[in-house]
Amino acid sequence: MQKDIGRRFQRNKKKINSKPGGAMVASSDVEFSLDGMSIMPQRDGNLQIPNFVKPKSTFATSNIGESNGKRNGDKVRGNRRSKSGHSSYAGSRISGGNSNSHLPSGVASAPAGLGIDKVAVGEVDSHLKSVSSYVSNSSGADRSFSSNSSSDTNSILYAGPTFTHSPAASNLPIPTFLHSPVSEKAEWQPPTGSVNSNMPFQFHQSSSVPSTPSEVAMGHNFCPMSRNDPSLQSIQQTNGFYSGHNSPHTNYSASTPSFNHFNAAGHPTGNITPTLNSPNNGIHCHSTSALDLLFHRDREQRLFRMLRQGSA
């Protein structure tokens, strides 16, 4: 009776193995769980361990293929049977060969027909632990690398809240005109040619509210052309042009004329009285100081950093 069961089982095994891919196990038959570190079958039968699960270690406790003096590719006969009548090697075979040599140490051979219930893997466990530690370490390294690279980029593009706090500020050649005191007047050269040039009045009178700190602090005294300048006292405005003729009954005004003082041709209609409360008094001129340069350079570097980082 036991011999018949064994022979019938061998005959069924040969039929299964003769089919193309009959003894191979699909990945859907095996359930992988990282928590339990085990491989659980979903249905009974001859379950084979897939190739991507098998570690490269020899089976230490009972290697049937090597004990019989046969290689892995040889067919193993069902001569050795356990007490229950099942052959001890029938738990795992791959298409006519013994796969017990590929199992890790510590795995007991399963009875026939039941498949492998549970594989307690020591080496796969350690391998998975090393993989998880490598993943965590690599992710941490990536995080540290990204933070370091971003801080390096910030330090290269923009160093400190202002330019003077930068360690490289002392190494830069500062122009000599920055050392001039604020109260000193700029040298103004009169234009070559006659004063009665073809420059309209409203072109000279274009002005705006001073925005830089030095212009606010110095007022209009620093500007080379202001109505306090004695060189401009004799200039008379007639028909939208400057003329050098001195007439005591005309006054020079530096205020911006309003639109109702212009005729159809765009020229002023007459003398314009200065409005003292106007914020546009005085001819506008750009006075560049060290504070202005640092302010604009700091603002430019902030914009450049925002553009590089994509936050603008």
Curated annotation (Swiss-Prot):
InterPro entries with a match to the protein in the record: PNRC-like_rgn
GO molecular function, one term: mRNA phosphatase activator activity
Alphabetical GO biological process terms: mRNA methylguanosine-cap decapping
Biased segments, Polar residues type: 85-103
Location of region: Disordered: 1-26, 45-106
Basic and acidic residues bias: start-end ranges: 68-77
Biased amino acid composition, Basic residues: 8-17
Cellular component per GO, a single term: RNA decapping complex
Domain of life: Eukaryota
Protein name: Uncharacterized protein C18G6.09c
